[in-house]
Amino acid sequence: WTSDGSAEDSGKEKKRAGCLLYNGKYVYFDKNGYALESYEKKYDDVPLVTGLKYDELVMQEKIPVKKEKVFSYLLELTTAIDKYNLSIDQIYIKEDGNALLISDKITVDLYNKKDIDIKISELAGMLKKVKGKSGTIDMKYFSEDHKIAVFQPKKSWKNLVKKVSLS
């Protein structure tokens, strides 16, 4: 038993928090940032992380990221995604270190690293509302006090282009 009263099973498989594409294979990592295993198969329930800068990966070792702050933010994100059972296909780390989440045809711009737990918990309901649509959920104005997110549907070209008769 551990100090928090939960049973610890040393034989238990570690949970995959996310994966990176490395040398043509998917390398899965846990919530502590350790590379667990690599497979050619991508598991649907594990978000693919793109845009992260890191050095060579070694199994069972911590992923050697260029910016530790960005990585701890990523791990905070994957933990919240798992906690609220969100279906996220991809987490894209932008140049500024902030993240875009991609779920089916919806892109979520988290905008900054604030209020992650609240943003992700609210996102579960938002994603249900826009299921089947394509577009962007912008969380630029979202905070604990002002739960505001803007959904911008993706414009389809066929609606914009008027039919021209060639007769």
PLM segments and residue spans:
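Charged, solvent-exposed interaction patches on well-folded alpha/beta domains
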Residues: 1-167
